[in-house]
A protein has these predicted regions:
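Residues at secondary-structure transition points
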Residues: 20, 52-56, 60, 130-134, ...
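Periplasmic/extracellular, small/polar-rich flexible segments of pilin-like filament-forming proteins
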Residues: 2-6, 75-187
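Conserved hydrophobic beta-strand within the GNAT/NAT acetyltransferase core sheet
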Residues: 25-28, 69, 143
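Alpha-helix exit/C-cap motif
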Residues: 48, 52-56, 63-85
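N-terminal leader/signal peptides at the extreme start of proteins
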Residues: 1-23
Length: 187
């Protein structure tokens, strides 16, 4: 040390204080707790808006498929009943043959990664018993979730060429138009 430098002098009982920059552990824990509470409140709302968006995507895909079925009907005087697997590969149901190329989209969006629903088309039920109308008279298009986590409250959205709309819940029970849950399917 140089001879002309002096050390700081302190009065008796004085302590040299240094100012530390940063947060205490308690402050950090309070902030983490607040963020956790906000996330617990916001996440269910976010999930419900994603479900609503997916249902809207399915309804739009059903409307598009119904229009395609009507165009198909005007050209061939019959509707095309088909089923599709989870990958969106569709095949006509008996006794029809599967046209090539397949004229309808079997997923609710263009890419299989973005598609939450698989589309199908079946003959309309008669309304009495277990019979169905011929595909030359009526067709019912439906959208079912590709996985159970897509929409746990609505299992199947359906609309027929007669204009009748319906849906089923997670237990496969038909949700009636008079039921408050029907607005989940068709607002």
């Amino acid at each position: 040390m140089a001879a002309n430098q002096q050390l700081p002098r302190f009065e008796t009982g004085q302590v040299m204080r240094t100012k530390n920059a940063g947060f205490t552990l308690i402050e950090v824990m309070v902030v983490v707790a607040i963020i956790g509470i906000l996330a617990a409140i916001a996440y269910p709302s976010y999930q419900e808006s994603v479900r609503k968006g997916r249902r809207a995507q399915a309804r739009a895909a059903l409307a598009d498929l119904l229009q395609q079925q009507e165009r198909y009907f005007t050209q061939r005087n019959t509707y095309l009943a088909f089923t599709s697997d989870n990958a969106g590969v569709a095949s006509a149901t008996f006794p029809q043959t599967t046209p090539s190329p397949f004229p309808f989209r079997a997923l609710s969006s263009d890419g299989s990664v973005n598609s939450a629903y698989v589309l199908e088309s079946n003959a309309c039920p008669t309304g009495t018993g277990s019979g169905v109308l011929p595909v030359t008279e009526c067709i019912r298009v439906s959208a079912k979730p590709r996985t159970a986590t897509v929409d746990p409250s609505v299992k199947l959205l359906m609309v027929a060429t007669t204009g009748e709309k319906s849906c089923t819940d997670a237990t496969n029970a038909v949700i009636l138009k008079t039921d408050a849950k029907f607005k989940l399917c068709w607002p």
